[in-house]
């Protein structure tokens, strides 16, 4: 597994946005934090006093002090200690292999000398409990399996340790090394779809599907990882729109929709499929506006009905030239036209009309997939030997970062294709931006149809809020 070591890793998804619903719950229920955690309604700004009094949260997981740190998990329990040599009983730390927004990732070995990955995150973090709760109910061969969870005291901080199987490679590192055959793409995409089908059946939305979060064994067995952004979506609850890595972000998120569905994951896996086909991201936007512009350049201009279906954060019209779709032109080198047809059913502005995961699995492109044929492919052999004769575990990513290290997806990581928190202010595109982006204009209904900006600017989608898209978690 690989993890980007990007300096912008902490400025990824706007995790500090306010959630009014959760604020109300926290004000009224300071003594009932158990209920809030079990219902996935935590707020990132809960004060430390509440956190310190919340020692029996996370579905009755029992924690103990550092002097007696017996821990419990769904699968095993042990005593956790920390010393100057990073050794966490019964796991021996081998080395740090990555660092993400919320924690560090270590390669370790257990008492049976089996390699595992340990993701260490500070306990006070808002997303910790949700990630662990979701991991406990996810049980599928193509989803990352949690082996253990325990707490340690380190540098006067309470750390949550999540233990996973160690899986050495990512789809990002594979795409950096070689072009994939169409049949191997089918097998990988089929496995990814099975993982998505499983989590969507539980109303879980992953919300950050990227090549770096797709792990691969040496045989090509696929595992969906990094559930740090995952959430169980409820129809009567809003969620933050500033989520998901930019290249793989659905258009409804780009216009500030806060009542989205699991169809945002469908868009993401469509981007993954296209990237496997052409060897690079299909929509490599430089910021949120450029991202939307690049999508429009390929798919054509959204209709008025499309805009309404995407539920933008504020009522506005999108005024731009009548851009004809260039979708088939973008994929003209792809010989298998069934996969192009499948992508045309995924890349649809209206989330309701976008293909469901069941429709994707039933599509002719995946009709004859033989999941037991992995041994017939040689794509994974590119990792077998490096120049020094050792197994090559560290590679660069074509889609996410300029520098990567092992175990990307275990940390809630960030990369160059993710925007910073300050980018909620929608700014003017650079001169290198594509034409369709530079012609986007927001028109506020209260402005009597007058453009709120010059033609070479992309103004806020929320003019009444000084350009800031208000998000909820």
Curated annotation (Swiss-Prot):
SUPFAM superfamilies: Protein kinase-like (PK-like)
Binding residue positions for ATP: 97-105, 119
PROSITE patterns: PROTEIN_KINASE_ATP, PROTEIN_KINASE_DOM, PROTEIN_KINASE_TYR
Compositionally biased tracts (Low complexity): 7-84, 442-466
The encoding gene: glkA
EC number annotated for this UniProt entry: 2.7.11.26
Known catalytic reactions: L-seryl-[tau protein] + ATP = O-phospho-L-seryl-[tau protein] + ADP + H(+); L-threonyl-[tau protein] + ATP = O-phospho-L-threonyl-[tau protein] + ADP + H(+)
Protein name: Probable serine/threonine-protein kinase glkA
Keywords: ATP-binding, Kinase, Nucleotide-binding, Serine/threonine-protein kinase, Transferase
Top-rank lineage group of the source organism: Eukaryota
Biological processes, Gene Ontology terms: glycogen metabolic process; intracellular signal transduction; negative regulation of gene expression; positive regulation of gene expression; positive regulation of myosin II filament assembly; positive regulation of phosphatidylinositol 3-kinase/protein kinase B signal transduction; regulation of myosin II filament assembly; small GTPase-mediated signal transduction
Coiled coil: none
Organism annotation: Dictyostelium discoideum
MF GO annotations: ATP binding; protein kinase activity; protein serine/threonine kinase activity
Residue ranges annotated for the Protein kinase domain, each copy included: 91-366
TM regions (residue ranges): none
Keyword Nucleotide-binding on entry: yes
Location of region: Disordered: 1-84, 389-418, 437-473
Active site (record annotation): 208 (proton acceptor)
